[in-house]
UniProtKB/Swiss-Prot annotation:
UniProt PTM comment: Contains 5 disulfide bonds. Cleavage of the propeptide depends on the processing quadruplet motif (XXXR, with at least one of X being E).
Disulphide-bonded residues: C39-C56, C46-C67, C55-C81, C69-C79, C72-C93
Entry similarity comment: Belongs to the neurotoxin 19 (CSTX) family. 11 (latartoxin) subfamily.
Keywords: Amidation, Disulfide bond, Knottin, Neurotoxin, Secreted, Signal, Toxin
Signal peptide: 1-19
Protein purpose: Insect toxin. Causes paralysis in larvae of C.vicina by depolarizing membranes at the neuromuscular junction.
Domain notes: The presence of a 'disulfide through disulfide knot' structurally defines this protein as a knottin.
UniProt protein name: Latartoxin-2a
Tissue expression from the record: Expressed by the venom gland.
Propeptide: 20-37
Length: 109
């Protein structure tokens, strides 16, 4: 009997801790989204070229660059030249966080 009570208390504690973690995780994702939508002044703006990477050539041919675009809160698009590896890593991270968030919400909801 004591074991069942202890298990029940552990489950209740675990559930409340998990719900707090999920709330924190959801707010963290929202913070990331709003942060990503904030536009900043650009030094290597390639918006006029969109995804045409001619504006992102490296004269020393040391790195490959991509024109990466986001849509800001105002609906305005902003594009910058970034290293290809950075853009690809960022996209993998975004997809991973999105999948984890969906799975957590699916399990809870």
């Amino acid at each position: 009997m004591k074991v069942l009570v202890i298990i029940a208390l552990c489950l209740v504690a675990f559930q409340s801790a998990l719900s707090k973690k999920i709330e924190n995780f959801e707010s963290y994702i929202e913070d990331l989204k709003s942060e990503a939508r904030e536009c900043i002044p650009l030094y290597n703006d390639c918006t006029a070229f969109k995804y045409n990477n001619n504006c992102c050539k490296d004269p020393e041919k040391k790195y490959q660059y991509k024109c990466s675009c986001i849509v800001c809160k105002e609906g305005k698009e902003q594009c910058t030249c970034q290293r290809k590896e950075t853009v690809e890593s960022m996209m993998k991270c975004v997809r991973f966080v999105k999948k984890v968030g969906e799975k957590v919400i699916e399990k809870v909801g």
